[in-house]
């Protein structure tokens, strides 16, 4: 039985997230259906994370097992003929039998995009969060820096989600403006449910003057979700980089 890893990219507007849901279109469901048509047997696809409804992926890693002998380099072309235009497989390769797209992942980067202009741009609908009031990226960077390090991130996750631990390590959180677009890039060893979007909302809170950047440390210590900023809309969020280095596999997506 072969274990095959896939690199894919998708525009998530038309999907109810990654994970399979009954009677709803999801990326996992769509991908599994396409793979089954190519390899001629049902498959279960493991993804590197559960992106929410409307969230996009510039690069996403998944893996599945198959008895098919089709060469891995031919798989992207075969799969893409059965996939809709908003999901594209860019690479396929054989991996160790113990490789797991989520369990083997060491770090992930998400990028949140804000369209910061007084006028909307129709080409960024569902691709960036339109925010008409001017945001000072220097204040945003000062706020973002407060998240870097190992902390309990319970204050920036969805209330009611059940996990063993809410402690995570954030390696960097960078804010960059390019014209009317503001990019918030955050890398961590893992993300809680809605954590990246709640962090972005808290950074915007600081730029709005609703909290001081240095208060973010206190908010994290409190674990109080209501003290942090809002969970910003999903359309501005992209999975943008993944790192694998667990002794089983060592690669990055994108390469």
Positions of PLM-derived features:
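Structured-RNA-binding interfaces characteristic of tRNA pseudouridine synthases
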Residues: 1-255
């Amino acid at each position: 039985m072969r274990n095959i890893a896939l690199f894919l990219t998708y525009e998530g507007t038309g999907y109810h997230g990654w994970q399979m849901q009954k009677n709803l279109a999801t990326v996992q469901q769509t991908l599994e259906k396409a793979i089954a048509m190519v390899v001629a047997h049902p498959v279960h696809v493991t993804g590197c994370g559960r992106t929410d409804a409307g969230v996009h992926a510039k690069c996403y890693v998944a893996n599945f097992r198959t008895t098919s002998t089709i060469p891995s380099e031919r798989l992207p072309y075969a799969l893409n003929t059965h996939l809709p235009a908003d999901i594209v497989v860019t690479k396929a390769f054989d991996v160790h039998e113990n490789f797991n797209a989520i369990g083997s992942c060491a770090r992930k980067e998400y990028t949140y995009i804000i369209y910061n202009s007084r006028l909307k741009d129709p080409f960024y609908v569902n691709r960036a969060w339109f925010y008409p009031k001017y945001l000072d990226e220097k204040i945003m960077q000062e706020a973002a820096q407060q998240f870097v390090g190992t902390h309990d991130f319970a204050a920036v996750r969805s209330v009611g989600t059940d996990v063993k631990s809410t402690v995570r390590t954030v390696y960097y959180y960078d804010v960059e403006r390019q014209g009317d677009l503001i990019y918030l890039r955050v890398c961590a060893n893992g993300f809680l449910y809605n954590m990246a979007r709640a962090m972005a909302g808290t950074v915007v809170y600081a730029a709005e003057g609703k909290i001081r950047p240095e208060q973010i440390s206190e908010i994290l210590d409190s674990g109080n979700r209501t003290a942090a900023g809002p969970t910003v809309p999903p359309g501005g969020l992209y999975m943008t980089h993944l790192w694998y280095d667990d002794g089983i596999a060592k690669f990055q997506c994108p390469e």
